[in-house]
Amino acid sequence: MSKKLISIVDVKDYVGQEVTIGAWVANKSGKGKIAFVQLRDGSAFFQGVAFKPNFIEKYGEESGLEKFDVIKRLNQETSVYVTGIVKEDERSKFGYELDITDLEIIGESHEYPITPKEHGTDFLMDNRHLWLRSRKQMAVMQIRNAIIYATYEFFDQNGFIKFDSPILSENAAEDSTELFETDYFGKPAFLSQSGQLYLEAGAMALGRVFDFGPVFRAEKSKTRRHLTEFWMMDAEYSFLSHEESLDLQEAYVKALIQGVLDRAPQALDILERDVEALKRYITEPFKRVSYDDAITLLQEHEADEDTDYEHLEHGDDFGSPHETWISNYFGVPTFVVNYPASFKAFYMKPVPGNPERVLCADLLAPEGYGEIIGGSMREDNYDALVAKMDELGMDKSEYDFYLDLRKYGSVPHGGFGIGIERMVTFVAGTKHIREAIPFPRMLHRIRP
């Protein structure tokens, strides 16, 4: 095959011309003198049509029938070079169609296990390496790519520097009960839960920094919102106030949604996502409500017919049903700010005049998707941080470098983190986080 290949996504530029496409057979149908071949090449899907009389006319009866028979016998996922004339076709769901003039098989496909019918979740996850080829799974990956692209673009435009934090560490950033431990030349080491502590060092050097990479949490959870390995974007910045941080987070999330609308509209269409809702999340301001006001709201509405959550008192943490109700009540992504210090991380700065609350925020996505961002102002006073660590019985020697940051020109600073898979799930409108990453790692699943 010596002809120049084009991508399916570019066929609109070749109407009336003969082109060659390298693709896989996603499906086929037809009978008698006509065969329909649905093609995919990673950029998009496209339909080719083969007419038996045309093949006989071009190649002669014997060769024409042989070539047409090859097309009729194609198995799903056979890889091919297919040549034909691009035609506009309003009747086609793709908008264009390929009048096939030739087809060459590159790689035969055996009987493909994932056929166009319903399959159980365990079967699909066992065959994840093949399930990724389906239209909806490809669409989710395209949305993931658009979100990652928009992340780098946003932080570059806002003066942040990419700062890589280590994957291996000897201490924990968050809950030490959720660590994966490994041997590091005879010493215990842990897979990173977050790059935050190291990013704070970066912010003291470079002002505004972010990292993006895999993190690991040994959560024995089987919910639709948890993975043991996922990708996290953490950002850290100096000299920003809490309100300015919330403004930045809101702008970031809106930039991610806009990035998907711009770069992957066809993926949203395949997934039948409510695009008007996504546009509204961009145009309308996010809501901001204090933790205590949110608790009061929950208490006032817990007897409503359409509520389904347990009673909470001030000082209790939210569960998923509470987060869902809060975000749906306001109808847009909602910041819940100033949680109790009792169940938040040691490094969070107290609310001035109210040491029982901390300057933090969780961003709750509507439509039942829950928390997608967590952030806070960091305690920048050395003595206050030491006192908090003593109160919690923490070994300060494990955090000597972190404490040093408060001894040499400490400044007000804060940061936030977003689990990319949760954002992908929200924007894509899918039901389970396992579809938001190519090969999910969950409780009881570490292959393929």
From Swiss-Prot:
Homodimer. GO terms for cellular component: cytoplasm. The gene is asnS. It is an enzyme of class 6 (ligase). PROSITE patterns: AA_TRNA_LIGASE_II. InterPro entries: Aa-tRNA-synt_II, aa-tRNA-synth_II, aa-tRNA-synth_II/BPL/LPL, Asn-tRNA-ligase, Asp/Asn-tRNA-synth_IIb, NA-bd_OB-fold, NA-bd_OB_tRNA. One of its GO terms (biological process) is asparaginyl-tRNA aminoacylation. It is found in: Cytoplasm. One of its GO terms (molecular function) is ATP binding. Its EC number is 6.1.1.22. It comes from the Bacteria. This is Asparagine--tRNA ligase. It catalyses: tRNA(Asn) + L-asparagine + ATP = L-asparaginyl-tRNA(Asn) + AMP + diphosphate + H(+). CDD domains: AsnRS_cyto_like_N, AsxRS_core. Keywords: Aminoacyl-tRNA synthetase, ATP-binding, Cytoplasm, Ligase, Nucleotide-binding, Protein biosynthesis. Belongs to the class-II aminoacyl-tRNA synthetase family.
